[in-house]
Amino acid sequence: MPKVSSDTLWDIAAAEVRSRESRTDEEEAEEEDAHFPSQRTVFFMGSKAGGKTTILLRFLERDETAKPTLALEYTFGRRARGHNTPKDIAHLWELGGGISLSDLVQIPITADNVSFLSVVLVLDLSKPNALWETMESLLGSARNQVEKVCAALQKTGESRSGKQRVPRVLHKDYPDRELISPFPVPLLIVGSKFDIFQDFDSEKRKVICKTLRFLAHFYGASLIFTSSKSETTMSKSRSFINQLAFGTERPKSISTDPSKPLAIPAGSDSLSQIGPPVATEVDIGTLHAKNPFDLWKKVFEKVFPHESTRERKELKDPVKDPQFSEPLIDSIRAQKDQELDQYKREQAKSWKSLALDP
């Protein structure tokens, strides 16, 4: 005799609510868009000359030589889910110049795409002294822009039919949910140039690894280390970016060994697994930290003192950059520069020739 379910309609509804509460916004998005083409935006930013363009080209499987990104560049990728199906589109933005051009975040982060937006932060592991400032400055600028856009939408009463709630809400079982401050949109932190990083002193590697694990967990982000010289790590990074760009299945492999490239999907780590900051060179008791985030920052910058790079001054003059050469325009510009120099010399001579009476 078949078993008859004793669940009432109320029991079934309650179970459905519990099921939905346990899912992340990204998982809900994947279910909602399973049968419809999507358009998502992925915003790449990070360390100057940190390998963002290389990672982006590898993701798009383009056999091109990476060129320095002058300011802000746009491209796109498409992916078919099956035979004779509309292709999903990923709008891909890349911010160049490190922290010097952070004001440009307002261009790729708009009311039209904020509900479909995710961020990839690329940090150069070979330059740990600039790592914290780069992370804090760029994520701060991006967060402020997202919050500004969301506030404007709420003020005008507009509603966007998006896949994810913004700011996103972590499910109730997310590790340490009450102790972290999740980034308002999905975030992937990529540690680049692992091939150089792996030659660092083991204690310094441990400090960097634990700190980035804490930061990724604090922001509710995924974390992966990669190297352009390792196809294995580049393939893993593609999987993480694919999930953001096209809603593919979340990578499940986890690696927390500091001697190997880290790979930690969001929600797979916890404060208890990460442990306290590495303090072999620091007496934590002497540090006056306001909160755990501030403590990790103080410990990290004791080991890797902040170096002011003045990136704004380091930016190359695009007029002299061969990447943007225009022979005809450049020759006219050179002629005008010569005329200006000659005019300045003549004016200087005329002032010197003046006999000014006392």
Swiss-Prot record:
Name by which UniProt lists this protein: Cytoplasmic dynein 2 light intermediate chain 1
Domain of life: Eukaryota
Subcellular location: Cytoplasm; Cell projection, Cilium; Cytoplasm, Cytoskeleton, Cilium basal body; Cytoplasm, Cytoskeleton, Cilium axoneme
UniProt-listed InterPro entries: DYNC2LI1, Dynein_light_int_chain, P-loop_NTPase
Coiled coil stretches, renumbered: none
GO terms for biological process, alphabetical: intraciliary retrograde transport; intraciliary transport; intraciliary transport involved in cilium assembly
Function statement: Acts as one of several non-catalytic accessory components of the cytoplasmic dynein 2 complex (dynein-2 complex), a motor protein complex that drives the movement of cargos along microtubules within cilia and flagella in concert with the intraflagellar transport (IFT) system, facilitating the assembly of these organelles.
GO cellular component, one term: centrosome
Main location: cytoplasm
Molecular function (Gene Ontology), one example: dynein heavy chain binding
Annotated spans, Disordered: 1-35, 307-358
Family: Belongs to the dynein light intermediate chain family.
Keywords: Cell projection, Cilium, Cilium biogenesis/degradation, Cytoplasm, Cytoskeleton, Developmental protein, Dynein, Microtubule, Motor protein
Biased composition regions of type Basic and acidic residues, renumbered to the chain: 307-320, 333-349
Subunit structure: Light intermediate chain of the cytoplasmic dynein complex 2, a multisubunit complex composed at least of eleven different proteins. The cytoplasmic dynein 2 complex consists of two catalytic heavy chains (HCs) and a number of non-catalytic subunits presented by intermediate chains (ICs), light intermediate chains (LICs) and light chains (LCs).
Segments of skewed composition (Acidic residues): 24-33
Gene: dync2li1
